[in-house]
């Protein structure tokens, strides 16, 4: 296990009715707020009305940025920055899932950057100051409610990039599982796949000896496997929604990657799919993951897949190691299929003509390779894309 520094300062208010705290919490940072949200579901399910009522009760002025895309775009970020500057906003409040929160993070950082915001996304060292950020979570998926990363798309350049800064962690986040009762089944499925993929990225590391972190990762994966199906079948099951919501936060808030390197595999590949074809992130990850697993399985990586098969899927440890590994990968594929997620890239509109270009793009920002357990290059990525097609 590598050395590390540990600090996850986001304050979490978890449970039914926890939205009531936002007035007092926001007033610690000021009295002018930008609310950032997506397509309007928060108005239909009452969250918007409750949040704005609390703001009014506490004499907090608020402004709005709606219409944040599922893959939030830099053009939308720039609109939010202008609203903040024009109204001297003190805090950015995201109400929604990872898209709204990611958009809010880059707005909050961009307020203090005088150049082109996209340049700041490409080079996070340009971030010098960030407005306070808070979130009210309505979708269990990205874990953005507790981490310092945002992912933003530029449709003009076909780029989807991650940007991070310690001050981009939300000051506080409200996690009320009842707010996810109305999430459609397809979004629940994609969100569950996203949580599992975040966990896989830390779990399948080339760094050995992080026993505690791996044990937590295995528990999160078992949680997703159990409660993802339950949440699909009974959308208002509180325990299912609560466990998925907490798993979402723990999967990517930094805990699982402590003492490990942070060289991810499937996310850089999927970001290219989303950048060019604007597909649902979790769907792309679910398609790629089993094929990536099959591709990197060899004598050197076998031990990790054996642990995964035994500790997550409960496969008999007395079986042959390769049999355990292949059964674990097969179970992963079948689980995503059971959630109703497409299994082929062609099913979600990906064109064959761009596979080679996207493979090269996937490794361009990481020295030509991605991944930790078994690093892969552009040629490897192309083969995984072909296997997934």
Swiss-Prot record:
Keywords, alphabetical: NAD, Oxidoreductase
UniProt keyword Membrane present: no
Cellular component terms (Gene Ontology): cytosol
Origin: domain of life: Bacteria
GO BP of this protein: 1-butanol biosynthetic process
InterPro entries for the chain: ADH_Fe/GldA, ADH_Fe_C, ADH_Fe_CS, BDH-like
Pfam families linked: ADH_Fe_C, Fe-ADH
Keyword Plastid: no
The protein's enzyme class: oxidoreductase
GO molecular function terms noted in the UniProt entry: alcohol dehydrogenase (NAD+) activity; alcohol dehydrogenase (NADP+) activity; butanol dehydrogenase (NAD+) activity; metal ion binding; methylglyoxal reductase (NADPH) (acetol producing) activity
EC number: 1.1.1.-
Pathway as given in its UniProt record: Alcohol metabolism; butanol biosynthesis
The protein's assembly and partners: Homodimer.
PANTHER family attached to this UniProt entry: ALCOHOL DEHYDROGENASE YQHD (PTHR43633:SF1)
Note: Primarily NADH-dependent, although some NADPH-dependent activity was observed.
Family: Belongs to the iron-containing alcohol dehydrogenase family.
Protein name: NADH-dependent butanol dehydrogenase A
Source organism (scientific name): Clostridium acetobutylicum (strain ATCC 824 / DSM 792 / JCM 1419 / IAM 19013 / LMG 5710 / NBRC 13948 / NRRL B-527 / VKM B-1787 / 2291 / W)
Annotated gene: bdhA
């Amino acid at each position: 296990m590598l050395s590390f520094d540990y600090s996850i300062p986001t304050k979490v208010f978890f449970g039914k009715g926890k939205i009531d705290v936002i007035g007092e919490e926001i007033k610690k940072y000021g009295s002018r707020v930008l609310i950032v949200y997506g397509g309007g579901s928060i108005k239909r399910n009452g969250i918007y009305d409750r949040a704005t009522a609390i703001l009014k009760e506490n004499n907090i002025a608020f402004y709005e940025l709606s219409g944040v895309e599922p893959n939030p775009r830099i053009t939308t970020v720039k609109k939010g920055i202008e609203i903040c500057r024009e109204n001297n906003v003190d805090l950015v409040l995201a109400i929604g899932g990872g898209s709204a929160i990611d958009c809010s993070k880059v707005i909050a950082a961009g307020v203090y950057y005088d150049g082109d915001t996209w340049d700041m996304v490409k080079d996070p060292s340009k971030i010098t100051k960030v407005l306070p950020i808070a979130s009210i979570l309505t979708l269990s998926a990205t874990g953005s409610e507790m981490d310092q990363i945002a992912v933003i798309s530029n449709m003009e350049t076909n780029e989807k990039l991650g940007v991070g800064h310690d001050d981009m962690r939300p000051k506080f986040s409200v996690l009320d599982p009842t707010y996810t009762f109305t999430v459609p089944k397809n979004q629940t499925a994609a969100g569950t796949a996203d949580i599992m993929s975040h966990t896989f990225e830390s779990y399948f590391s080339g760094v050995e000896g992080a026993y505690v972190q791996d044990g937590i990762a295995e528990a999160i994966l078992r949680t997703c496997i159990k409660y993802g199906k339950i949440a699909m079948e009974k959308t208002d099951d509180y325990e299912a929604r609560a466990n998925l919501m907490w798993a979402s936060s723990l999967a990517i808030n930094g805990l699982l990657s402590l003492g490990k390197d942070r060289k991810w595999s499937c996310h850089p590949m999927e970001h290219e799919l989303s950048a060019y074809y604007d597909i649902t992130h979790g769907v792309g990850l679910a398609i790629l993951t089993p094929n990536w697993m099959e591709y990197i399985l060899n004598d050197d990586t076998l031990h990790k897949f054996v642990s995964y098969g035994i500790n997550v899927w409960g496969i008999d440890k007395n079986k042959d190691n390769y049999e355990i590994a292949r059964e674990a990968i097969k179970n992963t594929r079948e689980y995503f299929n059971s959630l109703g997620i497409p299994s082929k890239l062609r099913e979600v509109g990906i064109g064959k003509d761009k596979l080679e270009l996207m493979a090269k793009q996937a490794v361009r920002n990481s020295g030509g390779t991605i991944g930790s357990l078994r690093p892969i290059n552009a040629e490897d990525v192309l083969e995984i894309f072909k296997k997934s097609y």
